[in-house]
Amino acid sequence: IIIDGGSSDQTLQLIKKYSTRVKCLISEKDNGIYDALNKGVKLATGDIVGFIHSDDILASPQVISNIVNKFKGNTADIVYGDLLFVDREKPDIIHRFWHSGEFKKSKLRYGWAPPHPAFYIRRALYKKYGCFDLNFKIAADYDQMLRLLLVPYLQIIYVPEVFVKMRLGGESTKLNNALLSTKEIIAIMRKHNINWQVAILTRKLSKLWQIFSKFKRSNIS
């Protein structure tokens, strides 16, 4: 399923080259990225839902099959992995390594969350807990993940594998959106009864660790 925001470049022509592999294409103006994601969720018919944004790259051809096998083998509700922030022009150059780590509910109090592009869930959870809140323009994915991760009985599986390479320069990584992103994250933390003063600080520190982990990962490689 491809949701396009009414592109005026060569996007649609490129998609047509792969028309036999595209189940559904919508190209129309929307109310932002989360409106587009909500459209995709409503059109989905499979058991598992995940998202790949236009600048994202699956880390390997085996990523999707590995995710599906985890759902099958563990009757999981949520499966998530790791993510690499890479150079926009040269995606082999790593800028940050987002190592998610094993899930512990206590980590949510410190601003922890897995990377949304590496977060796959059963479609039934959208029906039960809702889609993305369009009141948030940049951080609705964080709100949606918290909504699910705080549910006590869901089976959540971490896969220590890079699922996605994200090119730097997305909406939430642009400088002019940094203040709005922080404002929304604080509002979301308050909504979910998380001490935002502590969580925002530890969240910022975790980004420094991601940069350090990049060098550590490079040395291992």
Region spans (language model):
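Nucleotide-sugar donor-binding/catalytic module of glycosyltransferases
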Residues: 1-177, 216
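Charged/polar, solvent-exposed surface patches and flexible loops
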Residues: 13, 17, 69, 187, ...
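A generic membrane alpha-helix/interface feature
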Residues: 140, 171, 185-187, 211
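Catalytic core of nucleotide-sugar-dependent glycosyltransferases
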Residues: 162, 174-199
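Membrane-proximal basic amphipathic "stem/tether" segments
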Residues: 190-221
